[in-house]
From Swiss-Prot:
Taxonomy of the source species: Bacteria, Bacillati, Actinomycetota, Actinomycetes, Mycobacteriales
Cell location: Cytoplasm
This protein's name: Probable molybdenum cofactor guanylyltransferase
HAMAP family, per the entry: MobA
Positions bound to Mg(2+): 107
A Gene Ontology molecular function term of the record: GTP binding
Main function: Transfers a GMP moiety from GTP to Mo-molybdopterin (Mo-MPT) cofactor (Moco or molybdenum cofactor) to form Mo-molybdopterin guanine dinucleotide (Mo-MGD) cofactor.
Known catalytic reactions: Mo-molybdopterin + GTP + H(+) = Mo-molybdopterin guanine dinucleotide + diphosphate
Swiss-Prot/TrEMBL GO biological process terms: Mo-molybdopterin cofactor biosynthetic process
Keywords, alphabetical: Cytoplasm, GTP-binding, Magnesium, Metal-binding, Molybdenum cofactor biosynthesis, Nucleotide-binding, Transferase
NCBIfam families per UniProt: PRK00576.1
Organism: Mycobacterium tuberculosis (strain ATCC 25618 / H37Rv)
Family: Belongs to the MobA family.
Assigned GO CC terms: cytoplasm; plasma membrane
Record flagged with keyword GTP-binding: yes
Amino acid sequence: MAELAPDTVPLAGVVLAGGESRRMGRDKATLPLPGGTTTLVEHMVGILGQRCAPVFVMAAPGQPLPTLPVPVLRDELPGLGPLPATGRGLRAAAEAGVRLAFVCAVDMPYLTVELIEDLARRAVQTDAEVVLPWDGRNHYLAAVYRTDLADRVDTLVGAGERKMSALVDASDALRIVMADSRPLTNVNSAAGLHAPMQPGR
């Protein structure tokens, strides 16, 4: 199948910023990056904004965030994990007329546009409902989802499901083996955020 040129696949972006950040001990979204002028959520919006349009940020009710150049949606079911928030983000993307959305956690500062583009290209080539990276484990929150899965999410949540794995297991999913998993790194401490990582080769 012919390769699709970069940026030809319409793709929305959803940043899940409303997690409880128990291991961090503070809100990850507003954690300043080295240099202190940009927060983690601003950084993630900037990465996704290079490839995705529109971009949505899912936040908890009352969660303080810096002023962002994208819509902020408040989680209607806080405390239930990422599945309901993902569904809300997918629905917003679908209402914006976009068929695919890249969904990620807010704590992935080493995420690359190249990874996002690769997953989007695979989603179009295979027509899979979900395309997610795999490096020994599934990365549900760094994946491309069809936005029409929003209804399926609502059904799963209504049945008591809380895990992203429930959505992937109920969908036509394609797992992409990642030779370099550094872009998928989640930061769970301020020290981890400030620790430099070697660039990929």
